[in-house]
Amino acid sequence: RQMCIRDSLHTVDGIHWTAEVDIQIPGNGSVEYSYHIYRDGRTIRTEWNSLPRILHVADNPKKVYRIEDCWKNLPEQQYFYTSAFTESLLAHRERSAAPKSYKKGLLIKAYAPCIDSDHCLALCGNQKALGDWNPDKAALMSDIDFPEWQVEVDAGKISFPLEYKFVLYNKKERRAVAWENNPNRYMADPQIAANETLAVGDRYVYFNLPAWKGSGVAVPVFSLRSEKSFGVGDFGDLKRMIDWAVATNQKAVQILPINDTTMTHTWTDSYPYSSISIYAFHPMYADLKQLGSLKDKKVMAEFNKRQKELNALPAVDYEAVNKTKWEYFHLIFKQEGEKVLASDAFRNFYEANKEWLQPYAVFSYLRDAYKTPNFREWPKYATYDAKEIETLCRPDSADYPHIAIYYYIQFNLHLQLLAATEHARANGVVLKGDIPIGISRNSVEAWKEPHYFNLNGQAGAPPDDFSVNGQNWGLPTYNWDVMEKDGYAWWMKRFHKMAEYFDAYRIDHILGFFRIWEIPMHAVHGLLGQFVPALPMTREEIESYGLAFREDFFLKPYIHEYFLGQIFGPHTDYVKQTFIEPTDTWEIYRMRPEFDTQRKVEAYFAGKTDDDSIWIRDGLYALISDVLFVPDRNNPHEYHPRIGVQHDYIYRALNDWEKAAFNRLYDQYYYHRHNDFWGQQAMKKLPQLTQSTRMLVCGEDLGMIPDCVAWVMNDLRILSLEIQRMPKDPKQEFGHTDWYPYRSVCTISTHDMSTLRGWWEEDFQQTQRYYNTMLGHYGAAPATATPELCEEVVRNHLHSNSILCILSLQDWMSMDGKWRNPNVQEERINIPANPRHYWRWRMHLTLEQLMKAESLNEKIRSMIESTGR
């Protein structure tokens, strides 16, 4: 139980702080406590408290504990203290008892997280109780509060001064295997009185042993295929994927977001990063076999037939799968729902999750009833009212059965994912989730808590290797000022919920916590966006770089006769007659008012999918974005240089002097101006968010990275993402796996990229350079990535210094010609440049076949072992 006493400490010298506290002996025999700094009654600083301080006390009301602690900052190796290690990778499932208490006791505590359950920490020193410097007779320490270790020795039998060291002890072999990497520790006589125990804590222990490194597999849940799945991967399949990870000695399984994305019940809902709830899971991930069989054998036989048909498809048929699964949900709910909803297990789940479960269920019901997820268009309940929602959810309401089915589905999804989580933890595998940076503007959160979001803008990403026009995710941005006022409670709840199922997570687009790329609602592409928050430039500041400010020329699309033919070819005259009009300036045009935004152009071409229409539409998009500066969203008299404009015609229209001035301005704005500012923004949010749970934090730090990102992630011990074909150093074409930082996750490809085999065939000149410079081969590169080449690339990544090497399932399988997919193009999961991409890739063989693919599995096992992972 937590100690609820708050007591002030006092100091005489400004360094050492003391207090005396009288407490009752707690029922469970332990006291939790922590230290905070207060000013004017408010907490202004809290020590690192992911692992609370625990003192196990004797059942003796006269006992005095003298505690010597030091303030705890975030440990340098904080990642080893996360639940990924303490609950899974290096878990101690059978803990020893609390140390025996003595009349005069010396309790020594130390932190040592990198010790597996076959070993323990021990104390060896110049006393008989500590082995008289014989490490094999050292005093074994208790792991009751692992990764903190503790032992109490009888101070009455100690002849001070005390000298000691920590040793690593092998419990099976009953011998010490390593001394700590530290000089002898020394303690003068602390004058311990009768009925007193001196507790000395905050020792950190390090050994000169090889650094822990692990490997893992990344695969979307929807991509899993087993003999039992129903045309899409489910949480039952996730357990089977964990079994494969165990069989190949991998330590992590990484998945994509699994939240409900249902808006239209069409394939466009397949995009996993635009959910309608940050809590609810997608119903399609339910393992129907775990829900039970229908009593109607004829109907059940029909579903079994459909299961085989859908499961035989090479890719996910999103609409057919979800339609069929929902038919099953309705039937099984009618058969089992009343009993399940009356169970104690469900009631406990409901009470713990009611805050999000009830609004989600009502939102889903109203979405289908009103045939739109856009709650602003609902004839009733468009504005969230808790009392009205509560009335709808009453069991005697006519709407209740339509709402309660969502309770039933979410409860079963919770049980199934939790079972997969527990299966992973029991087998020493970390389940790594994915937290999208955004939410959908048509979501439960936008409906229920609109004050947290800026719904008049669109989140996205500036141009990068994934997309030359930037990315427009269409998601609202966060109102961080409002979130800050309640201590980021919205995010805290989100992280706490995720920690129920995951021991590690990837922050999708971690840059969003520094700044987000916000695109105006009238834009389709990402080029017209601006960073938020940002420091826009005044007219005077722009001119201070030597660039005379010309408002009409800099802020309006530059459309000149000479390049229209280059863009539109045979359609040039049609474009002139329909979409643009001449100005008073010779050979200069402007957009007609009915087509002067990208959204207006998009609306005009809606439903037109022929090549000519797309050619003209994309050309018009390019014309509209051909501006030198973008007005600030809050102050139209301040400006942001348009991202990537050096590739456009308006930049070419500048003279050499103007180009040089603009380049100086552009470089200062995008690479220097905001470093401290954005770093401060991130440090307002990320420390308390990343430390609100004990999950291992990994950041997706790809794209246009300001310098402040590296130092913030380093200060907060967040693992970076390293990808060889997207090096952090812009002067390098490829990253060097030997140079990767230890605090990182390395991979060959992400879900937003082509696989290793796909990339090999995209740009043969680049592939040739990689073949010669990075792999060290002479001569011409093969036209395709052979299994031997793929194995070489995989091995290089396994040899990297990164603490985790997590490869896509496709890249693992690329090493075996027998088992890899014969069709390389089928393996790509997402194409970021296409906002309407269909997310439907499925592994081409079943998990049962994968488990029996011994040539591949043995190769993976041996490579992992030989590379020390």
Identify the residue ranges that each predicted region occupies:
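Catalytic cores of glycan-processing enzymes that make or break glycosidic bonds
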Residues: 80-103, 107, 154-157, 188-869
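Primarily marks secretory-pathway-exposed extracellular/lumenal segments that are disulfide-
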Residues: 74-75
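Boundary detector for helix-to-coil junctions that initiate low-complexity/charged tails
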Residues: 67-71
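Aromatic-rich carbohydrate-binding modules that target alpha-glucans
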Residues: 1-2, 6-30, 38-58, 107, ...
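Catalytic "initiation/cleavage/transfer" segments centered on a nucleophilic residue
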Residues: 63-65
